[in-house]
Amino acid sequence: ALLIVAIPVILIQLIITIVFFDSLWIKTNKGMTRALVSEIQTFIEVYSNDNYEKDDIKNIFSLYQDLNIEFIEDDDFNFSYDERWFSPIDRTLRRELKSKFALEIFWFDTTSYKELVDLRIKYQNGYFKFIVPKDRLTSTSARLFGLWITVPAFIVVIISLIFLISSFS
């Protein structure tokens, strides 16, 4: 009799959690990643304009956009690319970068630093190295969302079990 109440509630809660969490998390991360890649594209466009001082542009973007930017003069742009297809952050970043830049002119690493992403984009006779905080690409409220969904589910199950037990006595 207890299973008649508990199992449907737990199953519905699991399905709702997975569907909403997945949809919300992916949409949020996609929007954040798209904004970051657009900022990087804007930086490169402004940097290409000779009307502005290059160091001032880097300083402004570093200060206001939280981007650590360095231009490295090196004609060699052949970084070993570790494809992590099962990482949502990597997949979303790769997709957004492909939409703005050619595949062979960007490279990124999300695993070397715990809280940072190393992103490099080829530019003329070198490349830009962007060090970006990982929280610019992904929402950190996933655990909070999980608790927000799980705790009420357990409370509802416990209350329903109490009512079920009291109805038998």
Where are the predicted features?
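Alpha-helical transmembrane segments of membrane proteins, especially the N-terminal anchoring helices
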Residues: A1-I26, M32, K129-S169
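Extracytoplasmic
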Residues: R84-P152
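Juxtamembrane segments flanking the first transmembrane helix
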Residues: A1-W85
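Phenylalanine-focused residue identity feature
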Residues: F20-F21, F43, F61, F71, ...
